[in-house]
């Protein structure tokens, strides 16, 4: 299995980006064993890591900046990046990441909210995997257990802009939300928005107040999942993060 890491980070002279993760091939969370990424311009950093799928099907990882072999900066890691992987040894995951800064309202990510006030005691299962997949991930902590995050867009698989038919996201890693869409059913370019969905009433109650999100054809391979992540969705006037 290949994990293909991609991240933009403008480094200074002498700095490098490394990735550290929960599996042997990514350093077993030991800072001295973080794996360097490669770059040709000091901005776009990449790494293809050949790994064995862990027994629990979960890979957690984070990005770090190193200078002279020392970890000088770490992205916000209170909620580690979490990837649920399939057991397919030939699977490729292309991880299109951005650096995670400290969220403006960090307190929403504390246990007082995620495990009490806005707790999700009965979590969904991990997102269903597809042979050719588009995995969309987003952080949205201000959503209570009666609601969930969804995605609606210009594709039948995303509801054809009918919010009540939106694809709903998993809270398996709450307050991060994830869903993997069958990319073979998408006709690019793709346009979509996040929606807030009331599970009890079975209807959408709010759209994100932003322009449509747009994705040109990313040329996803036959046995590849492209993962894109959004950090800290903006707050909607209802109080939910949208």
Positions of predicted regions on the chain:
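Intrinsically disordered, low-complexity glycine/proline-rich and charged
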Residues: 98-108
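Basic K/R-rich, polyanion-interacting modules in nucleoproteins and related proteins
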Residues: 1-9, 107-142
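Conserved small/polar residues in nucleotide/adenosyl-binding loops
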Residues: 231-238
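Ser/Thr- (and often Asn-) enriched beta-sheet segments in non-cytosolic proteins
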Residues: 2-6, 46-50, 92, 135-137, ...
């Amino acid at each position: 299995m290949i994990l293909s890491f991609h991240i933009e980070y403008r480094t200074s002279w002498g700095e490098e980006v490394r990735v550290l993760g929960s599996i042997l091939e990514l350093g077993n969370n030991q800072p001295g064993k973080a794996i360097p990424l490669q770059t040709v311009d000091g901005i776009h950093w990449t790494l293809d890591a050949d790994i064995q799928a862990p027994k629990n099907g979960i890979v957690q990882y984070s990005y770090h900046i190193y200078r002279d072999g020392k970890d000088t900066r770490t992205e916000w890691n209170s909620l580690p990046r979490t990837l649920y992987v399939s057991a397919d040894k030939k699977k490729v995951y292309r991880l299109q990441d951005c650096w995670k800064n400290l969220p403006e309202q960090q307190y929403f990510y504390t246990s007082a909210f995620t495990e009490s006030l806005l707790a999700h005691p009965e979590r969904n299962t991990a997102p269903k995997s597809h042979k050719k997949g588009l995995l969309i991930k987003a952080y949205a902590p201000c959503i209570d257990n009666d609601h969930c995050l969804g995605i609606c867009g210009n594709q039948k698989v995303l509801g054809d802009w009918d919010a009540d038919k939106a694809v709903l996201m998993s809270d398996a890693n709450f307050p991060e939300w994830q869903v993997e869409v069958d990319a073979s059913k998408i006709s690019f370019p793709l346009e979509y928005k996040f929606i807030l969905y009331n599970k009890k009433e079975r209807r959408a109650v709010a759209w994100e107040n932003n322009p449509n999100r747009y994705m040109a054809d990313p040329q996803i391979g036959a046995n590849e999942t492209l993962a894109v992540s959004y950090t800290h969705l903006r707050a909607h006037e209802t109080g939910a993060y949208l």
